[in-house]
Structure formats: structure tokens, C-alpha cells
Amino acid sequence: MFLLTAEDKSVRTSKKIFETYHFAYDNPCIREVLEGVRPDVTVFMGAYDTGFLWGKGSSTASAYTSGLFQLLMNETAGNVGRFLYLSSEEVFGGEYTQDISCEENCAAYTVRAQAIAAGEELCRSYFNMGYETIVLRLDHLYGEPLTGAEARDICARMSVEGLETGEIRVNPHNRVALLHYSDAVEFLYAVITAKKMTYGVYQISSGETISVRSAAEFVAAELEGVKVVEDTGRERMEPVLSNQRFAEEFGIRIVHKPETEIGR
């Protein structure tokens, strides 16, 4: 396993990583790295890449899309293998009354979400040209963040809100399908080892919705003095991604449940 990161050399690495390369994704050295490593599968962290500082807005979005474009050009020019692009439910910012299919058009409203959606389109264009560039949308990924930059999921946001205000305010009618890191890794492994991919876009979801209030209560139970407050005007409905396409091709088995994992 090799790691390519735009973060500086202080970034933590795992013992399972053979070698780490610290380059921006549009660095001319990338082609040389890819030619030397020749990966069978490349996983672009996309929506979960902590190397991008989204507080800088449009400049970060430009760096994100240009870096992805350069990486894809070098990958496909060298024909080095499958390319997986990790996206999220964040590209759907509208209101939805039913599960969202893989073919639904993105409705991204924030700069970050628009950049992630633009990355999806770029990967799909390469897929349509015959390359194995696969978009994987992960639905409400959650788990224990190791850094502040990773604390972006709905449970982490609830924890921060509770610690800062003593309350977690939720819409009692809102529901969400939570996908634990560990389950997501198993599903990603199935994609990495698959002999052939049928489609250019897949959605990975637990397929099991719970009320946002229940999730908030699981979080509040681990935070002393924090209460859950209902507020019907507070937030939009969370999108729920249909996992039908992925389930038909790879199967879905959820091991880690929110009621036992949140707050661990």
C-alpha cells in the first residue's frame, strides 16, 4: 500500500503503508510516482480528504478539481488500473421525499459540495471513455474522528454542538442512514477486489434509517449535562441514498449499528 498526500510530512501514517509521497496532486512528479508504483487500484479520498482547507472557499475548490484532473490524466495515460473516487451524500443539498437513486442529478449548494460533485462528473466522463474510474458515494459515514479535520459527520457535529451549547437541536421528523467506518471499509474492499465493475457510480448506504433524534440521544448519553431539544424549523431533511445497485452486485451486510457504536 502506498499513500500519496498533499499534507505536509507531519501527517500520520500507518505501519501498513509501504511508502508515503508528499506531493500536491497536480505536481509534475505525480506521473513519475505512478509509473514507479503502478497501482492496481487508486482510491482518491475526495469528500474525506483532510488535506484540503475548505475555509478558503473557491481557491480550495480550484485546487481540488485541478488536482483531481491532473491525477486522472496521469492515471489514464499510464493505464495503471482502477480509480475509485469517494463522494458522499453531501452532493444532494435539496429536499427529497424518497431514497435517492444513483442516477439522480446532484444538487450541490456549498462550494465544497460543488467541488465534490464536479469531481464526480469528471470521473464519469473518463468512465464513459472506457476507463475504470468509479464514483462511490458513501451515505453519512460516521465513526470516531482522530483529528478535528475529520470531525465532519453528523454525529461529530452533534458532539461539538452539545459541548459548546449544552444542547443538541434536531428536527424530530428527520431520519438518516448511518454508515460506520468499519462497514464502509469492508464494502470498499469488495470493490477493490472485484474483477469487473458494471457501473460508473455506486452508492454505499447502510439502508437502515433511524431518526435524527435517536442519533442525538445516543450522542447526548455520552456527554454530561447535554440535552436533546426538538426544533422543527432547524434543519433540512437529510438525504438517504439508495444502495440497491451496490447490494445487487456486492451484497450488503451491516455489522456496526448506531445504537452500539455512537459514543464508543
What spans do the regions from the language model cover?
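Short, polar loop motifs at secondary-structure junctions
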Residues: 5-11
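Conserved catalytic-core motifs of eukaryotic protein kinase domains, centered on the activation segment
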Residues: 14, 52-59, 94-98, 147-148
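NAD(P)H-binding glycine-rich loop region in Rossmannoid oxidoreductase-like domains
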Residues: 23-63
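Conserved Rossmann-fold NAD(P)-dependent oxidoreductase catalytic core, especially the SDR/UDP-sugar
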Residues: 42-44, 69-111
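Short-chain dehydrogenase/reductase
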Residues: 61-62, 104, 108-120, 149-156, ...
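Conserved active-site helix of classical SDR/Rossmann-fold NAD(P)-dependent CH-OH oxidoreductases
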Residues: 68-69, 113-124, 156-159, 186
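NAD(P)-dependent short-chain dehydrogenase/reductase
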Residues: 124-176, 181
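C-terminal substrate-binding subdomain of Rossmann-fold SDR/epimerase-dehydratase oxidoreductases
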Residues: 171-264
